[in-house]
Amino acid sequence: MEAALAIATLVLVLVLCLAGVTAVSMQVRCIDAAREAARLAARGDVRSATDVARSIAPRAALVQVHRDGEFVVATVTAHSNLLPTLDIAARAISVAEPGSTAARPPCLPSRWSRCCCASPVRVHI
């Protein structure tokens, strides 16, 4: 009886450790994706920014790129399958370069918003 309880506890601890390592890995990927998206969008290349963020971010991540004054803000949010109550997100901010077209990102319609250049660009990966 005690051995069964010990084995079940050990398995639970191992699953939680695996979930923690997976969450940290997803966080690093979200940070990298947000950083690259903000950097590219600040140069005025919003489409490349979302494409690069898609390739770096975890699967099924939500990528948002929008202008906030003189800054370009990129946010990447992913959902952990092993920790269902945990959403992992990262945000990167970059100053828009002078003369860039980052002031008005091109419309990229998605399932969350209608195509409107005044709203943030939201891309579901």
Swiss-Prot record:
The keyword Acetylation does not apply. It is found in: Secreted; Host cytoplasm. Coiled coil: none annotated. GO terms for biological process: symbiont-mediated suppression of host apoptosis. Residues 1-33 form the signal peptide. The keyword tRNA-binding does not apply. Induction: Component of the Rv3654c-Rv3660c operon that is highly up-regulated during M.tuberculosis infection of macrophages. GO terms for cellular component: cytosol; extracellular region; host cell cytoplasm. Its main location: secreted. InterPro entries: Rv3655c/TadE. Keywords: Host cytoplasm, Secreted, Signal, Virulence. Interacts with human E3 ubiquitin-protein ligase RNF213. Effector protein that participates in the suppression of macrophage apoptosis by blocking the extrinsic pathway. Interferes with caspase-8 activation and binds to the host E3 ubiquitin-protein ligase RNF213, whose fusion partners have anti-apoptotic function. This is Apoptosis inhibitor Rv3655c. It comes from Mycobacterium tuberculosis (strain ATCC 25618 / H37Rv). The lineage of its organism: Bacteria, Bacillati, Actinomycetota, Actinomycetes, Mycobacteriales.
